[in-house]
Amino acid sequence: MRRILQNGIENPVLVDKYMMGSELEVDVISDGRDVLIPGVMQHIERAGVHSGDSIAVYPPYNISDIMMHRIIECSEKLALSLGTKGLVNIQYLIWQNELYVIEVNPRASRTVPYISKVTGVPMVDLATQVMTGTAVRDLGFGTGLCKAPPYFAVKVPVFSFEKLTDANSYLGPEMKSTGEVLGIGRTLNEALFKGLTAAGLSPAALAPGKETGVFLSVEEHDR
């Protein structure tokens, strides 16, 4: 901080508190009275990794019913309190069984095409209707949280570090992925397998009889 301030910068310095935990993301449609929530996505990567660089799983794979109820309740209150008519993106953090709001964006996010495809809810079309005066309850999808389908869907980021050789591959708050793919399966493992294969990470190469290895990177305080 001393190094930053000694240069006499004029812009404010923002210091965030970091909490380890599980990040979640919600895209909702609000008309100012009712809210439609197609689904809740859970990130696999640690908290602090940019949402665009995280693997997002729908539906969440280890969130309790009580916590899901809190997420839905908070999402509805936030969307209605903002007074937004259209799309709202909300990012949460669960840490020590407490729910924290990371940020709320009254706009579309990169997860809208993903959640629209895997839930069958055309979010952009519906949000456009809401913005032009149609009520959420008249869209034909009900209100609140939509029922989860009998399958898992994962959004897997695609990186280009082999081409951007000078880029630091360590994932953090700055987005580094250059694309993303979708994997759908009857189980979470099947969806992850398909997603990772499509992203070029090739888990299929780990066939029986082949010599393989796993690289583990562990923080000093976790050793």
PLM-predicted stretches and their roles:
Residues 1-209, 217-222:
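ATP-dependent carboxylate activation and anion-phosphoryl transfer catalytic cores
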